[in-house]
Swiss-Prot record:
This is Murein hydrolase activator EnvC. It comes from Escherichia coli (strain K12). Disruption phenotype: Mutants show defects in septation and separation, and form very long filaments (1.5-fold increase). The phenotype is exacerbated when combined with nlpD (over 8-fold longer), more exacerbated with a triple mepM (yebA) or ygeR disruption (15-fold longer) and further yet by the quadruple disruption mutant (envC-nlpD-mepM(yebA)-ygeR, over 21-fold longer). Quadruple mutants are less sensitive to ampicillin lysis. Pfam families: Peptidase_M23. SUPFAM superfamilies: Duplicated hybrid motif. GO terms for molecular function: hydrolase activity; metalloendopeptidase activity.
Amino acid sequence: MTRAVKPRRFAIRPIIYASVLSAGVLLCAFSAHADERDQLKSIQADIAAKERAVRQKQQQRASLLAQLKKQEEAISEATRKLRETQNTLNQLNKQIDEMNASIAKLEQQKAAQERSLAAQLDAAFRQGEHTGIQLILSGEESQRGQRLQAYFGYLNQARQETIAQLKQTREEVAMQRAELEEKQSEQQTLLYEQRAQQAKLTQALNERKKTLAGLESSIQQGQQQLSELRANESRLRNSIARAEAAAKARAEREAREAQAVRDRQKEATRKGTTYKPTESEKSLMSRTGGLGAPRGQAFWPVRGPTLHRYGEQLQGELRWKGMVIGASEGTEVKAIADGRVILADWLQGYGLVVVVEHGKGDMSLYGYNQSALVSVGSQVRAGQPIALVGSSGGQGRPSLYFEIRRQGQAVNPQPWLGR
């Protein structure tokens, strides 16, 4: 009996050991899963915090972009007024130069009249001496002398009246010159004020750009910038499409009118005669005839180094749809051909943009401008200044972004440029 009981007691120990070991393994497993869950929660919390930070920075960036737009629009307006003031000042200087020349001429005339008057007075005096002798010698000669004296008296009176008139003219010119100089002083004061205002705005803009650059470095550069570039391009296309739609009726009407002129020319040729279009009709046909085949016939919008070419890699799979030309800030941007302005506005990524329609689905686009010199609906001629080079849209240096679009699609603009 005793031998039978002992083995049963010894058999329980391995079971207990196995149970304890199994429980330990399970506890370790539960502990590991708990650690993983905690780690996952921590990672998720970090991700959520980073997402909130990114959203906050994006909101700050959007706010700064809005401020950047206002600053650049204000600089554009200040630059335009500065240019107008300078033009007015140049005109006043020209008027003052003309008045000075007129005064000098009048002074010369006055001196000549005074010399002539002195000669006449001397002649009259000499005639008076001869008249005394003639009174003794002959009564008839005496009468002749009296007539000569009367003649010289009238002549002297006329000379005195001329001198008085010249003096009056000189006083009037002096008054006008004083008035012009006063206006010039006012213009100079306004010019100084505007320059100070522009300097203040430029400083504020530079500060905004620095803040914007700091935010950009804290946001993911790759996909974020790629998405933004796509959005900028989409906004540009939409803005152009809206501008085209708004100008469509006028463009179609002008195209019909231009075709009517061409039909009249053809009809005249068929009849063996000629039809000479008016200047207005010539301008109409020129600005609605499109850019034609690229043969280097168009004006360069601005002269300078090409910083980016059409088709170069921009970001990821995105390519430049136009070209970027470096130039000094304030350089005149010229229309490449005749046309009509359909867009002059600030667009994110492109700054202040001017778009000119040339007819037959062709248009040219000018971006990054400091100031626009034309407005929507303006007719422009080839080589006419339409904007001033700038760095709007947050660009790092003054330059011009230039595109040519044909039937809504961006094409390589380089082959058209040559003049």
